[in-house]
Amino acid sequence: MSRRHSAEKREVLPDPKFGNVVITKFMNSVMYAGKKSVAEGIVYGALDLIEAKTRQGPLTVFEQALENVMPTIEVRSRRVGGATYQVPVEVRSTRRQALGIRWLIAAARGRNEKTMTERLSAELLDASNNRGSAVKKREDVHKMAEANRAFSHYRW
C-alpha cells in the first residue's frame, strides 16, 4: 500500500431499475470475472422473487436485510508488548455496508437452493426477518467484541 497517496473513492452509478447505488454495489459484489450482465440477472431475479413471495417492495426488504446484517462493532488485532489483543472498535459506515453486502452474498452462496437467484432471495428474506447465516455472522462478531470489552482501552 502506497504511503504517499490514498486512493480516491470512485463514484458508483445507481442501477437502471431502482436507481439505487447500494443495489449497484451489491451487484458488483455478486459479479464474477467481470460478467456484470449475469450478476444483474441474478440480483434482479432475486428481487423479483422476493416481490412475488412477500407482496412487498423488494427494495424495502433488501434495505431491511442489509440493515439487520451490518455490524456496528468489530474486533481488530492490536499487538502490545508481545501479546496480541482483540480490541473492539466501532465500524465506519462505508465498511459496515461493505461487510453487510459481503456477508449476505457469502451466506447466499453457502445455501442449498438450486440457483443463485433462489439462494439470494431466500437469504435476503431470512436476513430481513433477523434469521439466516449472515445475521448469525453479525451476532458472532458482536459477541466477540463484547467478550473482549476489557481490552477496549487499547483502541487507537
Curated annotation (Swiss-Prot):
GO terms for molecular function: rRNA binding; structural constituent of ribosome; tRNA binding. GO terms for biological process: translation. Pfam families: Ribosomal_S7. InterPro entries: Ribosomal_uS7 (IPR000235), Ribosomal_uS7_bac/org-type (IPR005717), Ribosomal_uS7_CS (IPR020606), Ribosomal_uS7_dom (IPR023798), Ribosomal_uS7_dom_sf (IPR036823). Keywords: Ribonucleoprotein, Ribosomal protein, RNA-binding, rRNA-binding, tRNA-binding. The keyword tRNA-binding applies. The keyword Ribonucleoprotein applies. GO terms for cellular component: small ribosomal subunit. Belongs to the universal ribosomal protein uS7 family. NCBIfam families: rpsG_bact (TIGR01029). Part of the 30S ribosomal subunit. Contacts proteins S9 and S11. PANTHER family: RIBOSOMAL PROTEIN S7. One of the primary rRNA binding proteins, it binds directly to 16S rRNA where it nucleates assembly of the head domain of the 30S subunit. Is located at the subunit interface close to the decoding center, probably blocks exit of the E-site tRNA. This is Small ribosomal subunit protein uS7. The gene is rpsG.
